[in-house]
Every structure is written in C-alpha cells, then in structure tokens.
Amino acid sequence: MLSIGAMANIKHTLQKELFLASGERLLSVVTVVKKKDKKPCYLCVVTTAPPVPVVTLCLIKQSEQREGEYKRKRSWQLDEIKWVDGRNEQFETHEFDLQLEKLYKWYALNPHERQNFLAVLNRQIQKSVRGQRAEFRNVPAAWLSEKSPEKVALGRAVQKTQHMDDEEDEEEEAQEFTALTDKEANELGKLFSECDFAIKDAEQFIEQLSRELHDLDGANMQSVLASEQKVLKMMEHIDNAISEADKFENRLDSYEDILGHVKETMEKIGGKNAMIEIANNNNIKLMKELNKVISQLDLPHSQQQALDEPDLKTANGRKAAIAAAQCLQQAMNSDIDPALLRLEAVQDQRKRFEKWKQKFSATVSRFMNNLFIHLGNEIGDMQVTSTELTLPNHSNVHRELTPYTELMHWTKAMDRKTYDGLMRVYTASLSKIYDRDVRNFFNLAKIQVTEKLRNSREDLDMSTSSRKSAVSTIPYGTLGINRDQWGPGVETADRMRFDALLEKVLAELEPIALQEQLFCINFFQMDVISPTTKNTQTTLEMEKAVDMTQSIISGAVSPSGDGVPQKRIDRQINEDVRKLMMGLFGCLEPELVSFIQSFERVDSFYSLYVFVRLTQHVMSAQDTHSFLSMTFASALVQVKRSFDRFMQNQLLSIREAKLHKRSKAILPYVENFENFAQTAEGIFRKSDRRTDMEKWYLQLVNAIFEGIQLHSQEHPKTPVQVVRMENYHHMYALLAQLKVPGLDALKKEAKKCYNDALKAYVTQYFGRPLEKLNQFFEGVQLKVAQGVKETEISYQMAFSKQELRKVIAQYPAREVKKGLENLYKKVEKHLSEEENLLQVVWHAMQEEFIAQYNYLEERIQKCYAGAMINLEFNIQDILAFFSDIARSH
C-alpha cells in the first residue's frame, strides 16, 4: 500500500512533468491496476485554467523504456461517464468500476487515494456537467457531501508539505467565472478609450487611475460632510412628529373610553329586544302547535257514530265506515311532537281513539269472518257435474269481496292480529273448494288419457303391476333387451294425446292460480310488507314504540347501502304470498306429481314429454317467483330426476346386455336405438332441454360403441369383424340421419370403425386365393433381398421359368371362379339381410383380388421379362367372375 508521502510525491511529479506545461492542474489522482500482477497506472482528474475551466478524466501510464517518464494514454470528458460503482461502501474496499464507452474495472492500491478520487470526481461532475450526470453506486454518502475529502484523507502529516498546493486548490476551486454586465463592459471600454496611451506607458496609466481615485475619495468625503447637516435637521423633524403623535394617541384613548360606555348600553338594549322577539316567536309557535294538535286529534261526531255503529252491508254504510276508519287511522298516526303527547288532554283523546279502534276492528272482524265462511259454504254445496276438462273459476267470490278491500287494508295497518285471523279464515274456507276442484280436475284428466287404454278408472293405479305379472317385467323401450321381451307399449298417438292433454292441464291451472294470487295480493295488501302508517299505538306505549321504531330502522338499512333492504323486502313479500297460496292450493303439487307419475309407470317415455312441456311453462313464466311458477319448478325437479333415472336405466341396460344363441348380427341396443332416437328427436327437436338430451346421447352412443367391441367377441355364430362392421354401419347411418351437431365426432368414429372392420373381414376371409403363387414370389423377394438381381432370378433352380409355369398351371380360370363362388356363399351366410352389405363386401373383395393380381403380374414382368409367361386369366376375367357370381345369387 502506498504511503501518504508517496501519494503526495506522485501527484507532485505528474503535475510538474505532464500538466504544468499545458497549463492544466491535477485535482486528484489514484494509482490503479487492472490485475494484481500488472504494472500500475494512474487515473487523474485534470482541469484547465480559468476563466473557462474544462475538467477531464485521464489515464496515465509510465514508460517502459525510460524510468520516470509518463505518458497520457486516454482522456474522457466527464459527461462521457455513465455511472461509477464503488462495489462496497466499506472503507477498506479497493475495487471500483467506471462505465465509459465500455466497462472498466480498477483496483486501487491505496484506499485513501480511492476515497479522495471518487469524492473529487463526484464534485467536478456536479459542477461541470449540465445534462445527464453520472450515477454513483455503493459509495458512502459522506464522501460525496464533504467539501474537501482530500484534506481529510491526507491528514496533518501532509499539511506542511502540501500547504501551498492546498491554498492554490482552494483559491482556484472557489473561483467562479462571472461574465461582465453590459454596463460594466461599457464603462471599461470608455476607460480604455480615454486612456489609449496606457497601452504604451503602463506607469502613466496607473498614475492617472490613482489621481481619479483620489478625486473620487475627496468628493465622497465632502458629500458625507454636507449630508451631516441634513441628517441633524431630519432628526429634529422626527422628534417633533413623535410629540404630535403622542398627543393624538391620548385624544384617541379618551374617545375609546366614551365609546366603551355606549357599547355596553347598546348591548343591554339589544339583549332585551332579543328576549322580547324570542317570547313572541315562542307564542306564535305554541299557537300553531296547539291548532295543529286540535285539528289532528279532532274527530267529527258523524264519524264517531259511524265507528260505533257501522253498517257494512250497504254501499253507503260501507263508504261512511271506511271514511271514518281512515280518519281515525290518520288521527292516531298524526305527526305530533313527543313533548305534546304528555299532555293529559292529548292522552285522553288518544285513549278514546284506541277504544273506537278496538270496537270497530271487532265489528269488521266478525262481519268478514262470517262473510268468508258463508261464501265458502255456498260454493262448497254446489255440485260439479261438468265432463269438460276445465278448472272452475271463482271470480264471483272475488267480486263479492272486492268492496271490502279497503277495510282489510285498514285492519292490516291498525290491528295485525285481527288481520292474520281473517287471513286464516279465508284460507280455510277457500282451500276446501280449491282442493275439491283440483282433485276432480286431475281425476277427469286421468280418465280422458286412459279411456282407450283401460276400461275403468280403478285400473289406472294398478296398470303397471297387472301388466308386469301378465306379460313381462321388462319395460317397453329398454335398449339393451330384444323387442320380443318387452312389455306392452303405448302407441305414438296415445303419447301425443297425453302431451296435448298435459298442455291443456297446465294451461288451465295458470289463469286460475294467477287470478287468485292477484286477488289475494290486492285484497290483503300483500305487496306492502309493513303498514304505511307511522304509529298505531297510544301514548301509554310510547316508549316501547320508540324502541321498536329504532330497531326496525337499524335492521332495515344495509351496512353497505347497496339496495339490499329492498331485495330483502321483495323476498319477504314473495314468501308471504307463496305461503298463502300454498294454504289455498295445498293439493296442487301432489296431484300434479301423482298425475305425471301415474303415466310414467305405464310408459317411461312419458317422462320425456313431461320434461319438455313443463320446462316450456317454467321458462315462459313472467313472474318466476309466483306460486304457480315455484310449483311447476318443484315438479320439474322431480320430472328431471325421473328423466335422468329413465336414461340411466337405458344406459345400464346397454352395459348389462346379454346375447342369446339365436341373436342376429345386429345387436339389440343398436337396433332399438334407432326407434329411441327418432322418438327423442321428435320430442326435443325445438326444446330448450335439447342440451340435456344431447348429453345423454353422448353417453348412450359411447356405451353402444363399447358394447359393440365387447359383444362382437361373444357372438355365437357370426365372425367378430362382421358383427362390428354391420353394427357400426347401422350406427353411422342412423347418426347421419339424426344430424345432431353434438354427435358429429361419434359419427366419424362410427364410420372409421366400420371401414376398419370391413378391411379386417376382407383380409381375413378373402385371404390369398393364389396362395402358392404368392409363396413363390415371397421366395423370389427373399433372394432379391439377399443380393440376387431380379433379372437373374430365373437362373435359380427353385425359381426357374419351368417352376413358375408349374405353379401358374395350378390356377386355371375355372378353378379360380369356383373358389370365388364358395367364398361368396360363405360371405352370404355371415352377413345379415337387414344391413344389405353383401355387395359392399363383395366389391371390397374384388378390389383386393385385383390388387393381388396386379402385384403378381408386376413381379412376373420384372423377374421373367421376355419369357412370355402370364396367368391364365386377366383383370377383365376377374371382373366377369365377380359380376357373374353376384348376379347368379
């Protein structure tokens, strides 16, 4: 490590030998090496002389030829430095990096030099660079903020030796180049023009400047002496002004005392006037409140009489009673200040209101209770003898009750207990009528559907058990079972009649249920979750009412304020309406489900019709929260389960299918799937539930494909390839006919499997009719593979021309045709007539035979060219053989 003395010596040497001659000054130097085993070099920060100093970074190296001689290798402007990396903020670190036109990595021999160099470099960059300045990384902040880190590094040891250099550094660093102003430049130019001789005689110029300076000093002294008298006179004027200001201030103080007394007097007068005005305002407000209370709590005598003895049977009596009840409701819910409620007169009046309310409410309750029971009994005694499939309309009941709607609204607002009791009486009275009508309606619907299937209604519930015991336990339409094992089925016309009647049943239910629901909402004011009035309680229960109101307010407001309370209110209203409708139509859903299930037991395909039809009504409902929509939706859930159960049974029947000894090549589930798919497409073609059916299509077809692969190996008589070929062909034709987009991939798979099975069957059963010829040329190919040329094969003893002619002589045209006839008979036995694939297979065998023939002819021409050797038949003969055999059968 270099000592401090050595550092100073290097700096002095470089300044003297390199920079002094060019007028430059060395600000800082650091001894560095690129690698530890190389010679050191010096990084220097150098500046030119004022007035416009230019600071540069130089790399100095020592000459190898001459000891003590230094050369400048590179120079960079400070704005070329992009960043400086100290590598580590520890003082003992020697490494640092400079990013110039490339990255330079240096190792400083002395950390003090490194510290001083980085500090000086940062200070000069901050002073000289006007644009983007270099970034200093991993350098202690103290180094960058100290004014003179070089002094701190060198210490007192070098103060004596470098005292003169430091003073020069400080003086030159403190110098700032300042340009002359225009005024200074003009005056300097004027001075030089007046003293033109100064260029020739500097001493004369200095003497003239001295004389002018002496004259200016004298003028300044005279000006100071002259201004002294003026200053004394000004001080005298200031003393006079101060005395006058004191007098004026004393006068203002006396005025302020007088105004203070006036202010206190006016404040007292203003306070008295304010109290008088407040008293007058209070009297006016009190009079208004009293008039308001009297007008709000006043009930005319005629209305009091109408409440005591109401006449609810006549229109005029009802009108008067309703008007009196509404006035009473308005008076009891009037907006009165809570303090006024404590007045004895107010409490007495509200007690009288409470008595009138209870008496009138009891009268209304008794009258409406009797009216509900009377209407229910009157309609219940009527005999229903209609044979048409219609649900009776009870709009006459609604017309009878409509005039009493406002009384029910008043009862809900003023006496909730009575209101709930009347609602229960109405539900009990009308529910008996609707139960009777709904049961009769569904019984009549069952009779109309089954009138051609059975002779009496008693057979309806026992139909399934009687059919199973008499004929079969296997439901009609089961895919995995042969048709001759199915139980009795239902004709398509019967299914269509059931679908039409189901639509009529659902259409009849909708207007009746909707009419009753709308009437109940209006009559019982069910679209309002709570009374619209503010208070129905007397002053005796005021404190309890206040607590209840606060709890309602706190519970009704959502913390997030996002409209949740309104949703909660709507949900509560819908719940109350459904509860009332459930009480009126309690048997509707069980009867509907029973009606559907009774026919599903007769024919499982009915579940498909119900699934589609019920979905249409649920999706087309305008009010999805209505009672009937919810009832249909609940029934639809059960129908969907029945539908899934039916499809699951079909899928299970395919997987568990068993073949009998006399089974045909077409598997039962493949044959049955055609009728099943056509029926399902007729039902689901334009339905919103088509996606559900397509999902089951995928499962069923995949199960059928798996079954074909499995059961083709178990077939007792027919070859595996034939079973697969015919069944895949049948499925491909059916899927192409259905044109279901979701089954396109399976249709392509069916076609591929069919072609693979056809190819495998032709390969296995057609084989090679010219077997010995094929074996002969297999030996030829073996010799060629061993290196014998094709043109020299005839010289081999085993493959000579004579041997070839002997083999060809074994296949005359007559024998070949006879072999093909036997093959045709075998194929005819294998294939079934339903699929009509005999000609397709026969044509494929013809193509295979022609391919083998062409191969043999090609081998003969290549290996025995010019020998005039040919088969006894040609391609035209082959075509004739196949055509004659096909026509003869």
From Swiss-Prot:
Pfam families: Sec3-PIP2_bind (PF15277), Sec3_C-term (PF20654), Sec3_CC (PF09763). The modification Phosphoserine is found at residues 145, 148, 456. GO terms for cellular component: exocyst; plasma membrane. SMART domains: Sec3-PIP2_bind. GO terms for biological process: exocytosis; Golgi to plasma membrane transport; protein transport. GO terms for molecular function: phosphatidylinositol-4,5-bisphosphate binding. Keywords: Coiled coil, Exocytosis, Phosphoprotein, Protein transport, Transport. The keyword Coiled coil applies. Transmembrane segments: none annotated. Component of the exocyst complex involved in the docking of exocytic vesicles with fusion sites on the plasma membrane. Belongs to the SEC3 family. The exocyst complex is composed of Sec3/Exoc1, Sec5/Exoc2, Sec6/Exoc3, Sec8/Exoc4, Sec10/Exoc5, Sec15/Exoc6, Exo70/Exoc7 and Exo84/Exoc8. This is Exocyst complex component 1.
